[in-house]
Amino acid sequence: MSHIIKIFPSNIEFSGREDESILDAALSAGIHLEHSCKAGDCGICESDLLAGEVVDSKGNIFGQGDKILTCCCKPKTALELNAHFFPELAGQTKKIVPCKVNSAVLVSGDVMTLKLRTPPTAKIGFLPGQYINLHYKGVTRSYSIANSDESNGIELHVRNVPNGQMSSLIFGELQENTLMRIEGPCGTFFIRESDRPIIFLAGGTGFAPVKSMVEHLIQGKCRREIYIYWGMQYSKDFYSALPQQWSEQHDNVHYIPVVSGDDAEWGGRKGFVHHAVMDDFDSLEFFDIYACGSPVMIDASKKDFMMKNLSVEHFYSDAFTASNNIEDNL
């Protein structure tokens, strides 16, 4: 059975079956509601239920006035939701295309830069910041796209997760010209048009979508002030010199690496990466912040930044979770 689902304040509607999540129904209808992990872990798809009833994956029933996760809840009745909708993504169509490995380079002890080439007529048409699903040998995992356009294929940053199915395949046997498949574009993490200064907050391979977005801004000769905070446990884990190069070549780009572990060789900033932001700015009222990393980092930074006058409408995030199909994107 299907029900009409209305989204406010954009005043759009679509049909959703009782056996599919609200988010899946929306995406099938070409309506891009805000989301990231699609597994119920990141909380980014949280919406206000204005009318109707839904059931979540555990069988819990929610009604009017409740907050729900659209990736986990299915409609029991007609619904009205207060949820974010992105018309910028309306023209995108998710597709699956073949690709071959161009190169697979180990750039740190546990991170590999994977570059894939697609057929000239099989582009996915992503926005900088979005991600793809990588399919190989019956395993599917999600990875953020690390380059800003498809002219040179697709670049991914893959961390070697202990017992990770996909990362074990990639680190163990991948060779040049290996045939794989990618599905995308996915996600609602992309740059919003604005003249506000930007803070990028990255943890680990959360640098991948940040790289994509910063490259896009630089190529477009953006004059907004750009601050890149990149956190790692140890200084040896920083696997790219690009942020430092950007800061040296562009006077509006500022790079602040932060180390959280006990690292005797590190003479720079120490502690949690979002604490460095807190220390550097008295107020975040006029900033746009893009955060990409673990759900713990994103939750902590969002709460703390709001104490520095950041409006929740100007906090954009993409959480790398270890559940379901994105365990190797941490």
UniProtKB/Swiss-Prot annotation:
SUPFAM superfamilies: 2Fe-2S ferredoxin-like (SSF54292), Ferredoxin reductase-like, C-terminal NADP-linked domain (SSF52343), Riboflavin synthase domain-like (SSF63380)
Pathway: Bacterial outer membrane biogenesis; LPS O-antigen biosynthesis
Disulfide pattern: none
Entry keyword Flavoprotein: no
Record keywords, A-Z: 2Fe-2S, Iron, Iron-sulfur, Lipopolysaccharide biosynthesis, Metal-binding
Co-factor note (free text): Binds 1 [2Fe-2S] cluster.
One Pfam family it belongs to: FAD_binding_6
Start and end residues of each 2Fe-2S ferredoxin-type domain: 3-89
Gene Ontology MF term list: 2 iron, 2 sulfur cluster binding; metal ion binding; oxidoreductase activity
Annotated binding of [2Fe-2S] cluster, by residue: C37, C42, C45
InterPro entries: 2Fe-2S_ferredoxin-like_sf (IPR036010), 2Fe-2S_ferredoxin-type (IPR001041), 2Fe2S_fd_BS (IPR006058), Beta-grasp_dom_sf (IPR012675), Cbr1-like_FAD-bd_dom (IPR008333), FAD-bd_FR_type (IPR017927), Flavoprot_Pyr_Nucl_cyt_Rdtase (IPR001709), FNR_nucleotide-bd (IPR039261)
Cofactor(s) demanded: [2Fe-2S] cluster
Domain FAD-binding FR-type, first and last residues per copy: 94-192
GO biological process, alphabetically ordered: O antigen biosynthetic process
Protein name per Swiss-Prot or TrEMBL: Protein RfbI
